[in-house]
Amino acid sequence: MSEQTQQQNSEEAVENVEAVETVETVGNADGVQEQAAAEPAYEDLQARIAELEAQLKDEQLRALANEQNLRRRHQQEIADTHKFAGQKFAVEMLPVKDYLEMALLDQSGNFDALKMGVQMTLNELQKAFDATQIKEINPKAGDKLDPNIHQAMQAVASEQEPNTVVGVMKKGYTLSDRVLRPAMVTVARKEA
């Protein structure tokens, strides 16, 4: 073979190798593109991870807020239970105070010693009431009737404005802010 033929064959061989490499490169590029299309991109995965982390954080915050609300509600219920724990006792003590006050109003005899003993008992009972936050509801004549703290027992014709207190039959009492017994009152009605 001549040098020229060898050189031509050599050039053709180089061209064939380059053509095969070009085809392989194009084939590999197509394969990479197909593989990339089949799998999500790294950025897409990062975005999904961030989305899931945000969702998890939101759920954690909601659970924490719910727990705090439950704890606060429970503490309030406990505080209310403590605040009104002596209510039954307080209701039972009200008639005792009423009877002692009636005994002090008795002007029939000379019972100074008895009266002094009753007064001392009443003072001690009042101290117990003060210690347990029991307060009197003792409306004055002319006060407007408040159905939350007063109970109208009788309506009488009066020159006072209707639905105002004329007199108190029995004092009312509260424990903290809760009414144990409303004040039993006589109220004014329009004169006929």
Curated annotation (Swiss-Prot):
A biological-process GO annotation: protein folding
One Gene Ontology cellular component: cytosol
Main location: cytoplasm
NCBIfam families assigned to the protein according to its UniProt record, in alphabetical order: PRK14139.1 (NF010737), PRK14140.1 (NF010738)
CDD domains for this protein: GrpE
Keyword Chaperone included in the entry's annotation: yes
Species classification: Bacteria, Pseudomonadati, Pseudomonadota, Betaproteobacteria, Neisseriales
Species of the source: Neisseria gonorrhoeae (strain ATCC 700825 / FA 1090)
HAMAP family membership: GrpE (MF_01151)
Record PANTHER family: GRPE PROTEIN, GRPE PROTEIN HOMOLOG, MITOCHONDRIAL
Keywords for the protein's UniProt record, in alphabetical order: Chaperone, Cytoplasm, Stress response
Role, per record: Participates actively in the response to hyperosmotic and heat shock by preventing the aggregation of stress-denatured proteins, in association with DnaK and GrpE. It is the nucleotide exchange factor for DnaK and may function as a thermosensor. Unfolded proteins bind initially to DnaJ; upon interaction with the DnaJ-bound protein, DnaK hydrolyzes its bound ATP, resulting in the formation of a stable complex. GrpE releases ADP from DnaK; ATP binding to DnaK triggers the release of the substrate protein, thus completing the reaction cycle.
Domain of life: Bacteria
Family membership: Belongs to the GrpE family.
Subunit structure: Homodimer.
Protein name: Protein GrpE
Subcellular location: Cytoplasm
